[in-house]
Swiss-Prot record:
Mg(2+) binds at E260. The keyword Acetylation does not apply. The keyword Metal-binding applies. One of its GO terms (biological process) is phenylalanyl-tRNA aminoacylation. It is found in: Cytoplasm. Transmembrane segments: none annotated. One of its GO terms (cellular component) is cytoplasm. This is Phenylalanine--tRNA ligase alpha subunit. It is an enzyme of class 6 (ligase). Binds 2 magnesium ions per tetramer. Tetramer of two alpha and two beta subunits.
Length: 360
């Protein structure tokens, strides 16, 4: 009969002497594998008498458990030694000279920069920033904004509609950031001064239009808000944004369902050699739409048009970015071309402010 004590001493010595994981695995197979020494002993238990089995069984099982424990402990020791060796080999010599940094660094996208510029300008006037979801209800995007049934903007060819829900209602990708104004008027009491930047979506794609574009709208609700206040705000914005000392503006009558009266705003500019300059010249360029908030919109938001009034405006962020920084095509804004971004992008620390300058 096998001497269990001698076998255990021999196996534990082999485990301790295993220099690497492969050698340790060989010891494990020789001891505990299907035909290993300990496994063969366990097979003999079936041929023993009950008395011998009760005496021999615990001894063999104990041997198996101790060998297994020794193998696990040795495996952990080998793993720790391997890790220590790898860390030692990969140690960084901090006395070596550093490598030169990359020639190019990340750039802030022009859209992000222009949004920050707009926020800085209106923030200086006391405006807060309001945001809302890109997916909106038909009620918030159209009905609450005085769009009548059958209006062209409600048609599939102009708006991205989502499949109807179980209750039959359908949601859509907002066509403007005006729903944020509705949410603000329903959740806050006047006086209200907010700007609403964000993504908007329409079926349109060419050199100056994309299916997704960026828009910023402004809203003022108060007891005494007038068109004169609107004109002053827009004039101050244009001077600050285009960084000119003065700018002439003209308001042309227009129509928007959510404002009455409504106007489109042109600013003075010159066009020479393919370059547009603002604050000079005898030409005009349209940049935004505006008007007094329609009484029906105020009612939809729970406000009394006999008690409060207000004005709103909206402009395309992508468009004014193109105008200010001389970008001829809108499509590269969304093409992730690193060369284009290196040319038109901004340094990360060029944070716009009216004190330090919008463009650094």
């Amino acid at each position: 009969m096998t001497d269990l004590h001698s076998l255990e001493s021999d196996l534990l010595a082999q485990v301790e002497g295993a220099a690497d994981e492969a050698a340790l695995e060989g010891v494990r197979v020789a001891a505990l594998g299907k035909k290993g020494a300990v496994s063969e002993l366990l097979k003999t238990l079936g041929s023993l008498s009950p008395e011998e089995r009760r005496e021999r069984g615990p001894l063999i099982n104990g041997l198996r458990d101790r060998v297994q424990g020794a193998i696990l402990a040795r495996r952990e020791t080998l793993a720790e030694a391997a890790l220590a060796a790898r860390l030692s080999a990969e140690r960084i010599d901090v006395t070596l000279p550093v490598r030169e940094g990359p020639e190019t660094r990340g750039r802030v996208h022009p859209i992000t920069q222009v949004i920050d510029e707009i926020t800085a300008i209106f923030g200086d006037m006391g405006f807060a920033v309001a945001e809302g979801p890109d997916i909106e209800t038909d009620e918030l995007n159209f009905t609450a904004l005085n769009f009548p049934e059958g209006h062209p903007a409600r048609e599939m060819h102009d708006t991205f509609f989502l499949p109807p829900g179980r209750d039959g209602t359908r949601k859509l990708l907002r066509t403007h950031t005006s729903p944020v104004q509705v949410r603000t008027m329903r959740s806050q009491q006047p006086p209200i001064r907010v700007i609403c930047p964000g993504r908007t979506y329409r079926h349109d794609s060419d050199q100056t239009h994309t299916p997704m574009f960026h828009q910023v709208e402004g809203l003022v609700i108060d007891r005494t808000a007038t068109l004169a206040h609107l004109k002053w705000i827009l004039e101050e914005f244009c001077k600050a944004f285009f960084e000119v000392e003065s700018v002439k503006m003209r308001f042309r009558p227009s129509f928007f369902p959510f404002t009455e009266p409504s106007a489109e705003v042109d600013i003075q500019c010159s066009r020479k050699g393919g370059e547009i300059r603002f604050g000079e010249g005898d030409d005009w360029l349209e940049i935004l739409g505006c008007g007094m908030v329609h009484p029906n919109v105020l009612r939809q938001c729970g406000l009394d048009p006999d008690e409060v009034q207000g004005f709103a405006w909206g402009m395309g962020i992508d468009r004014i970015a193109m105008l200010k920084y001389g970008m001829p095509d809108l499509r590269p804004f969304f093409e992730a071309d690193v060369r284009w971004l290196d040319h038109y992008g901004f340094r990360p620390l060029d944070i716009p402010s009216l004190v330090g300058g919008l463009t650094g």
